[in-house]
Amino acid sequence: MIKVVKVAHVQLCSCCGCLVSLADTYEKLLDVLNSIELVYCQTLADAREIPECDIALVEGSVCLDDHHSLEVAQEVRKKAKIVVALGACAATGGVTRYCKGNQLSKPVHSSFSPLTEVIKVDLAIPGCPPSPEAIVGVITAALNGDMEYLQPYAELAEKGSEACGCDVIYKVVNKSLCMGCGTCAAACPTRAIEMLDGRPNVLKELCIKCGACSVQCPRIRFPELIEKIE
């Protein structure tokens, strides 16, 4: 009998855009849902406790001033065999890194950290929101045990908030490895990367440190494969 993979979707401090991105896969979503058992997703059904699961997709950053948020993050790590940071907020901090507090009569500065800095995360899918193809690709690779495909996402999970457009500059452009394909610019959700003379230029004031560009860059994602082709 084939074991059904149990998957949980956990939402922390986020806008739910990552889950919407997953829904945008349309017919592919049906293939994914037919391959798994969705055991937890408060956006779709009310549930009090996170059950034990094989894969936990965690969306959103962790509010360090909210004990509940911290407890949920720790509970996910205990209950899930594989924890996936879904989207920029969970993977690198994203736009929540720029939070300056609310608009109450006594403004309080709320501190947010990516999930990768609070608990041990196995995989991180960047992007704000992550592309539907990336989400389905990671879930499918995890179901099939394709570690080669998952390697860039595992590395991003270890880097945490360090991921940003500077990765492309330091790791690729400055080492004369850039092919000028423009994949990094196409992957950027805020248009913080522009191509000048066939090379990417990062506009730091627009970069939200989502990590999408570095994971999509073929030089970073498939370095050995590119070397073989050349």
Curated annotation (Swiss-Prot):
A GO MF label: flavin adenine dinucleotide binding
UniProt xrefs under InterPro entries: 4Fe4S_Fe-S-bd, 4Fe4S_Fe_S_CS, Coenz_F420_hydrogenase_gsu, Hydrogenase_assoc-protein, NADH_UbQ_OxRdtase-like_20kDa, NiFe_Hase_small_N_sf
Highest taxon in the source lineage: Archaea
Keyword check for Oxidoreductase: yes
4Fe-4S ferredoxin-type domain span: 169-197, 198-228
Keywords linked to the UniProt accession: 4Fe-4S, Electron transport, Iron, Iron-sulfur, Metal-binding, Oxidoreductase, Repeat, Transport
Keyword field contains RNA-binding: no
PROSITE patterns: 4FE4S_FER_1, 4FE4S_FER_2
Chain positions recorded as [4Fe-4S] cluster 1 binding sites: C178, C181, C184, C217
NCBIfam families membership: FrhG
Functional description taken from the UniProt entry: Reduces the physiological low-potential two-electron acceptor coenzyme F420, and the artificial one-electron acceptor methylviologen.
Summary of subunit composition and partner proteins: Heterocomplex of the form (alpha(1)beta(1)gamma(1))(8).
Descriptive protein name: Coenzyme F420 hydrogenase subunit gamma
Gene: frhG
